[in-house]
A protein has these predicted regions:
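Beta-rich, blade/repeat-based domains predominating
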Residues: 56, 80-90, 129-142, 174-196, ...
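Short loop/turn segments immediately following beta-strands, especially the blade-tip
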Residues: 64-69, 111-118, 157-165, 214-227, ...
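Bacterial Sec-dependent N-terminal signal peptides
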Residues: 1-41, 397
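Short loop/turn segments immediately following the C-termini of beta-strands
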Residues: 52-54, 100-102, 148-150, 158, ...
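Loop/turn-rich, solvent-exposed surfaces of beta-rich toroidal or solenoidal domains
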Residues: 292-324, 332, 337-344, 353
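Blade-loop segments of beta-propeller domains
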Residues: 74-140
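A short beta-strand motif characteristic of beta-propeller blades
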Residues: 73-78, 121-126, 175-181, 231-237, ...
């Protein structure tokens, strides 16, 4: 695998002030005489943005984001190829990313993260053994990737210094689906650990399945125990041609919601003790674009959001019935082009949408009562943004 070259460049945040109806936006401007902003203020989060690097992007960008004012300040840029998905360790000290390639360059990368400066330092990289890793998570002892074209998931034990050991397990899936173009074989698109920490689900877009695994929480780099064991049942089947993409859980852990890329539907499940019971299917993509993308729930658990791409790009908005998890569509917010990923601030006030083909992250203020979104016209300019993560920062003393 080609060695990753990592360099951190420091940048300032260029602020364009506006008058009347002129839209304000922010972009990167290289620092010359100023040091990187250090320390954090109340209500500030560190924001990391993963990108595709086929254009002008260098890799990962970091910002301070104020979750009360909706303003961002650029911090740093880190060179790494195609970091299309990111995972953050529980203590915020380490960042794990994929390098999404359809060849032997496909990798998982480990970085040490400086929370004060917002900078990353590459620790090491390991081959995934499966092409196009597109999703990555960590439980603290292991890192797991979903490898789209490889039709597999890879497990990497974490060393004491936060770096990754070679893959301890690569689990490959067979099978196909009814869509001959998109489901010609297995395509793993997401891995999620259940709220109780006992199980892991893996979404297989190619076979219309959610694979189930039992987690061994004791598995780590030292004891070399297997992290995953096939569950019973081994998988949950959804309607043919759905194309499972991303899965999320309600804050109370009682419900799971699946966005299907091909059918454009959201499936609601009751979740209990490793089992999924389907309770509802509702349409998010009404124009049949076969491009549904990401799914998230507001921190208060009252609203669910699902992104759609390729046609009528935007965010479908649903209310959640608290006593049974049933969804009701309440609105639709048009966005920039190709909203592959989005995130909601921990306080629930803002949604940030990574619009890959508009080369911006759009910022929307969220109405806590209706769930509806309002564009504040504070776009953050980043080339091909496809993943946004927040890291809470300690308050300054």
């Amino acid at each position: 695998m080609k060695q990753l070259l990592i360099t951190t460049h420091l940048y300032t945040f260029a602020v364009i002030c506006v008058i009347a109806t002129t839209i304000s936006s922010c972009t990167f401007k290289k620092k010359t005489d100023m040091e990187t902003p250090t320390g954090t203020k109340e209500n500030e989060l560190t924001m990391l943005v993963g990108t595709y690097t086929s254009g002008d992007s260098k890799g990962i960008y970091s910002f301070r984001f104020n979750e009360e004012t909706g303003t961002a300040t650029a911090l740093s840029e880190t060179e790494v190829e195609n970091p299309s998905y990111l995972a953050v360790s529980a203590d915020g000290k380490f960042i794990y990313t994929v390098s999404e390639f359809n060849n032997e360059q496909a990798a998982a990368n480990a970085f040490a993260f400086n929370q004060e400066k917002g900078t990353l330092k590459l620790l090491n990289s390991q081959k995934t053994g499966g092409e196009d890793p597109c999703y990555i998570i960590t439980n603290g002892n292991n890192v797991i990737t979903a490898n789209y074209s490889g039709g597999s998931i890879s497990v990497f034990p974490i060393a004491k210094d936060g770096s990754l050991l070679p893959a301890s397990d690569i689990i490959k899936f067979e099978g196909s689906g009814t869509d001959k173009e998109r489901q010609e074989k297995s395509h793993l698109h997401c891995v999620r650990i259940t709220p109780d920490g006992k199980y892991m689900f893996a979404d297989n877009l190619g076979t219309d399945q959610i694979h189930k695994f039992i987690i061994n929480p004791a598995a780590n780099a030292e004891n070399k125990e297997a992290f995953l064991k096939e569950g019973s049942p081994a998988a949950f089947k959804v309607k043919a041609g759905s194309g499972p993409r991303h899965l999320t859980f309600s804050p109370n852990g009682h419900y799971a919601y699946l966005i299907n890329e091909l059918s454009g539907t959201v499936i609601a499940f009751e979740y209990k003790d490793g089992d999924l019971k389907e309770i509802q299917t509702i349409v998010a993509d009404t124009v049949c674009a076969k491009g549904s993308g990401d799914i998230h729930i507001s921190p208060d658990g009252k609203f669910l959001y699902a992104s759609n791409r390729l046609k009528a790009d935007g965010i479908a908005i649903f209310s959640i019935q608290p006593d049974n998890g049933i969804l009701t569509k309440v609105g639709y917010q048009l966005t920039g082009i190709h909203p592959r990923n989005f995130i909601i601030t921990p306080n629930g006030k803002y949604m940030l949408v990574a619009c890959r083909d508009s080369n911006v992250i759009q910022i929307y203020e969220r109405d806590a009562d209706t769930g509806l979104l309002t564009d504040i016209h504070g776009d953050i300019k980043v080339d091909k943004p496809v993943c946004v993560k927040f890291i809470p920062n300690p308050k300054q003393s």
